[in-house]
Amino acid sequence: METLLLTLLVVTIVCLDLGYTLECHNQQSSQTPTTTGCSGGETNCYKKRWRDHRGYRTERGCGCPSVKNGIEINCCTTDRCNN
């Protein structure tokens, strides 16, 4: 009986952990804040910032992309950390 209860406890913990989805902001520049659930077990959110002819631009989303010189990027690992 104890073994069965322990097994059920372990299965419950594993299932709850596998169901976790990181949530990141995904609005662009000065738009109203929105969020998205990241897919594929993604563990990072990013905030990318650069300047063009319109001024400073901001992009947010899931992942941690590589960027070219002159583009600032901040990556983080907690829910909605890229605001």
Swiss-Prot record:
Keywords: Acetylcholine receptor inhibiting toxin, Disulfide bond, Ion channel impairing toxin, Neurotoxin, Postsynaptic neurotoxin, Secreted, Signal, Toxin. Expressed by the venom gland. Residues 1-21 form the signal peptide. It is found in: Secreted. The keyword Ion transport does not apply. InterPro entries: Snake_3FTx, Snake_toxin-like_sf, Snake_toxin_con_site, Toxin_cobra-type. Disulfide bonds join C24-C45, C38-C62, C64-C75, C76-C81. It comes from the Eukaryota. GO terms for molecular function: acetylcholine receptor inhibitor activity; ion channel regulator activity; toxin activity. The record marks R54, R57 as: May be critical for toxicity. Pfam families: Toxin_cobra-type. The keyword Transcription regulation does not apply. CDD domains: TFP_snake_toxin. GO terms for cellular component: extracellular region. Belongs to the three-finger toxin family. Short-chain subfamily. Type I alpha-neurotoxin sub-subfamily. Binds to muscle nicotinic acetylcholine receptor (nAChR) and inhibit acetylcholine from binding to the receptor, thereby impairing neuromuscular transmission. This is Cobrotoxin homolog. It comes from Naja naja (Indian cobra).
